[in-house]
Amino acid sequence: MAQQIQAIRGMNDVLPAHISAWQHLEACAREVAGSYGYEEIRVPLIEHTELFKRAIGEFTDVVEKEMYTFTDQGGESLTLRPEATAGIVRAAISNGLLRGARHKLWCIGPMFRHERPQKGRYRQFYQLDVEAIGFAGPDVDAELIALTARLWRRLQLSGIRLEINSLGTPEARRVYREILVAYFRRHESALDADSRRRLEGNPLRILDSKNPQMAQVIAAAPLLTDHLDEPSRAHFAELAGALDRMGIAYRVNPRLVRGLDYYSRTVFEWLTDALGAQDAVCSGGRYDGLIAQLGGEVTPAVGFALGIERVVDLLVQAARVPAPAAADVYVIVNGAQSGAVLHMAEELRDALPHRRFEFNLGGGNFKAQFRRADKSGALLALICGDEELARGVVAMKPLREETGQTECPQAELAARLEELLVRLTSRRSG
């Protein structure tokens, strides 16, 4: 026997038994995003490496340590996307979407980061990304947060809390960066190796460290909110006021920063205590300088990314996963006329496109086929034997109640079948 090939570490299969939670989340996300006027966009999984270096930042962990980068046969450096915002912005610029227009876009798909795999953090992971491009005011920041709050309600999830902060303008952040670096230089002996490295490239990320031995020195660090420019203060105050009026609870977390360099002003995260260390299920913020940074006109924008696997875990924990759809009808062939019965099943699918038909494939005696019908979860079995077909009838046998089978003329089968399925469905749901 040939040696089995396993999945790559940190890249998981989603099997049919688990897919209903994913489909439910994706359907709810599509519904909620659409209700706010967002349109779907699909962008490549692979982009030029330079896109992510320029967008995310040379000194971020993502660019330095986590990207899947390779040189193709033509000598170009390409990267599997570690996040979607840069690709969406690149698509908007490349396709001229931003010429005097504003766009509200969303997409769902896989991202790739070479991290240490653990529950809730994988090397291939899926995200819902929602981006509002061309909108400058705090009202769109508030609407995006309201959209996520509505999605939690639509999914019937509770215990997800919101934290918000402002990173100010790049100019204000540069001033704060110098103050922060000077502070950490005075306490460099208290920093771990990773944080000392970040002092040179991305010192704000030190504030996001989870190292408990650094908690005290981080808690005493200067606050960015004490050094905000006045326009950013006003923007943040309007956002907070809008959230208050909508009844969306939040906590201002002055230590909240984002791991990607393109963020400015508003940043936010939705957190949960139900997933252990991986507590962030949705993160976002404003990136007013990114589009110009990638070669477009100066254009304001804001967006968020939601971790699909983490929200699926919450749905499973909360028992909010709809049952997988079972077949309505299982077609049993008790004889040699499988071709004729296949044709009949196709006609039934034409007549009843909203119903699910499972045809017994691969043969088997009547008893074995009936066991398969029962195991399929179908409400009803259609029994098509040589004798019945010769008389122009088909037998119908309910599988979920103690009712005898009845015969139906083939010419009336679709109508009679639908009538019986409506009755059986109402009994099962009742």
Where are these regions (language model features)?
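TRNA-recognition modules of translation machinery and tRNA-sensing kinases, especially anticodon-binding
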Residues: 1-428
